[in-house]
Amino acid sequence: FPKGAKTIYFSAPDKSGSWSIYSTTKLNESLWSAPQLLNESITSMGNDIFPYLSADGKSLYFSSNGHFGMGGYDLYVSRWSDEIGDWDTPQNLGFPFSSPADDFLYYDTPDGKYTIFASNRSTGRDSVNVYAIEYENLALKKTISQEEAANIALLNLPDNNQYDDGVEESDKADNS
């Protein structure tokens, strides 16, 4: 439990027997609020399990077999929206995090160097492998203008037409 955290997220079976994600908030040294089911965009008809809150408290990762996905349990993220004061619609993390098998237990290391998760994609359903994805901090070699970036996003097709794949700006130092 993170030091100073006031809200925790956990999975528990609901009245139908499906697992859903709940939150509870610390009211004082020994009292917690009644558990609250998360909003309907996160709560699915299937099982929503293994919630993990990012260190900055703005991203909630979890595994679900009830949202549209690649098959089995997939990994999802929902971002906190200050605008609506709630979690937004979950997004499937896609490959390499999600697969047609069961993928769960998402975790980012505190130093941001690794993402760790478990999956049975290359094992039987009764065992899992733990995967660690390492991120390298690559130095930014050059910044380019929006005009230069727009030209990079153009793809020349065999019929001499161009396909514009689009450009997104980033104001972050890591270009994410």
Where are these regions (language model features)?
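Short, conserved micro-motifs composed of acidic
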Residues: 1-176
